[in-house]
């Protein structure tokens, strides 16, 4: 699964709107929609924010793993 498909899947699992996630990332809703559609690449720092927020690993978000490993606590 591609990362853009994964971030949409996770957002929907959490019953969040694109606007809420866009606010979390400090971007506009249209920009976030472009991330989900694959039209625009999402910055790595935004992927880190999402991984922490959803408590999943970057491997899961990027599709390198299908296991929802928790983001390591520090």
Spans of features found by a protein language model:
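DNA major-groove recognition helix of helix-turn-helix/homeodomain DNA-binding modules
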Residues: 26, 45-60
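Short, charged recognition helix plus adjacent turn
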Residues: 34, 62-74
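Recognition helix of helix-turn-helix/homeodomain-like DNA-binding domains
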Residues: 26-41
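Conserved hydrophobic/aromatic packing and binding residues within compact polymer-binding modules
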Residues: 7, 21-22, 32-35, 61
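Short, Lys/Arg-enriched, disordered terminal segments
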Residues: 1-5, 74
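Short amphipathic helical patch at the helix-1/turn junction of helix-turn-helix
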Residues: 1, 12-13, 41, 52
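Short basic helix-loop element that most often maps to the first helix and adjoining turn
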Residues: 5-24, 49
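DNA major-groove recognition helix of helix-turn-helix
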Residues: 25, 36, 54, 65
């Amino acid at each position: 699964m591609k990362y853009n498909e994964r971030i949409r899947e996770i957002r929907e699992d959490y019953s969040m709107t694109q606007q809420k996630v866009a606010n979390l990332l400090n971007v506009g809703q249209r920009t976030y929609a472009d991330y989900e559609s694959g039209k625009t690449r999402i910055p790595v720092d935004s992927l880190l924010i999402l991984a922490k927020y959803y408590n999943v690993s970057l491997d899961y978000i990027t599709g390198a793993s299908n296991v929802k490993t928790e983001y390591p606590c520090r």
